[in-house]
Amino acid sequence: DEAILNECAEPRQMVWFADVTTETRPMVISSWTVPEASGNFCERGGRFGAHSSNESMAPVFYKKMAFIAFFNAGVRALDIRDPYHPKEVGYFIPSITEKTDKRCVPVEGKDRCKVAIQTNNLETDDRGYIYIVDRANTGMHILEMTGPARAVAGLK
């Protein structure tokens, strides 16, 4: 799914995992999302929910990790070694800067605007770096994993 409305003005947008062993009969086996309450994301402004994913074929990540751009909840690193029970092993939410744009919603005939991070797309490389960009003009961030995410990837 993809969040398309600001401030949670739509049903929750999830990450879905599917078994496509039989290509003509795909079957959803699990889902995952960032708990809204973990960061009051609906109140932060902008979109909150799954957007783009990256499941890298590089050996460092293949069949181990997936990364999801989650708009105002930043980028999320998921351990997918058990696709029936994906779990978050890391995340990064960029800080707002003077260049970060406002996102507005109509409220009682007037626009209510908030400055909000909108992590949009991401890419990884075979060294274990994650590159994320923000659609609200905050820029690009190059990330290096730490903690549990680094352990899942098998990086020293």
Can you annotate each of these PLM segments?
Residues 1-156:
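Feature marking well-ordered beta-strand scaffolds used for ligand recognition
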